[in-house]
């Protein structure tokens, strides 16, 4: 992943002026850079293709100077984005068909890593991202819910839920763990769904999000509460430091979760933070 973004085709006058100010390079080399255009050919597998260790990802056929000048850009783009796409694919595989949303921008190592990483995560199988810049620039689905601060900014949880449902009538996913998931959050969400049903304003897509606690236990209890209240179509989304191992464990415990928001551990590939691609 990242092969489509690798090649810089020229150096600007400002670039040349800066390089000259370093007093490292001679004038002949700087003049060469001023007129530089990559003339070689690059052969690459399509982005998103599964590859195995020691299998070439990309081949550069060019004069040695041109091939050398693009080395760092190629490795930077391919190593980082292939790392995140690989992590995303592992998370997606663990979820066994449930949707995985990329939620990692706040914990990414900088804005570029957050945006390129979100793009790579979608290539790796995520259904969308909470990174709106990435969604805009690369035409991928923008997805997400609201934050705990939304709830806390209102006088009470029920009022916050009602207002959110009013503002987002087609996709109402309510974050239920701000105060007490089973005694407050889920009951208040059910009450809002009942009110919407009575007013004939049920959203096309609706549900709750769990963001803390024992997700297996809470999801099973919440599922029963929603079903008993007459809302079997309500979806349950889970987040909270998820990765492929935790998702696999939760599913093996019978967790009633329909989709997953995965942030830190995906966007940083926390357990394997570097991809060892080389250029030879």
Task: Indicate residue ranges for each PLM-predicted region.
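Hydrophobic residues within beta-strands of alpha/beta enzymes
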Residues: 143, 208, 236, 258-260
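Segments forming glycine/polar-rich beta-alpha architectures that bind adenosine-containing cofactors
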Residues: 42
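Buried, small/hydrophobic-residue-enriched core segments of structured protein domains
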Residues: 24, 30-39, 48-52, 57-229, ...
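Short, small-residue-biased leader/transition segments that mark boundaries at the very start
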Residues: 2-7
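Gly/Ser/Thr/Ala-enriched C-terminal appendages of enzymes
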Residues: 224-229, 234, 242-280
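Compositionally biased, intrinsically disordered terminal targeting/sorting segments
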Residues: 8-13
């Amino acid at each position: 992943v990242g092969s489509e973004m690798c090649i810089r085709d020229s150096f600007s006058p400002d670039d040349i002026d800066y390089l000259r100010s370093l007093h490292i390079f001679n004038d002949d080399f700087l003049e060469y850079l001023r007129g530089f255009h990559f003339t070689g050919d690059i052969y690459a597998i399509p982005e998103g293709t599964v590859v195995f260790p020691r299998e070439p990802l990309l081949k550069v056929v060019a004069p040695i100077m041109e091939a050398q000048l693009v080395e760092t850009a190629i490795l930077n783009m391919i190593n980082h984005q292939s790392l995140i796409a690989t992590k995303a694919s592992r998370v997606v595989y663990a979820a066994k068909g449930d949707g995985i949303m990329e939620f990692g921008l706040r914990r990414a190592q900088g804005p570029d890593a957050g945006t390129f990483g979100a793009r790579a995560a979608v290539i790796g199988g995520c259904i969308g991202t909470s990174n709106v810049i990435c969604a805009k620039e690369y035409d991928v689905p923008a997805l997400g819910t609201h934050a705990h601060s939304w709830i806390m900014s209102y006088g009470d949880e029920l009022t916050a839920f009602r207002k959110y449902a009013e503002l987002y009538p087609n996709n109402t996913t309510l974050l239920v763990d701000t105060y007490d998931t089973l005694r407050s959050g889920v009951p208040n969400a059910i009450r809002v769904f009942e009110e919407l049903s009575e007013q004939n304003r049920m959203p096309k897509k609706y549900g709750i999000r769990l963001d803390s606690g024992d997700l297996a236990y809470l999801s099973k209890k919440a599922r029963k509460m929603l079903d008993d209240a007459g809302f079997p179509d309500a979806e349950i989304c889970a987040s909270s430091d998820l990765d492929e191992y935790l998702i696999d464990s939760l599913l093996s415990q019978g967790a009633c979760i329909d989709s997953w928001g995965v942030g830190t551990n995906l966007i940083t590939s926390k357990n394997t933070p570097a991809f060892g691609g080389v250029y030879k």
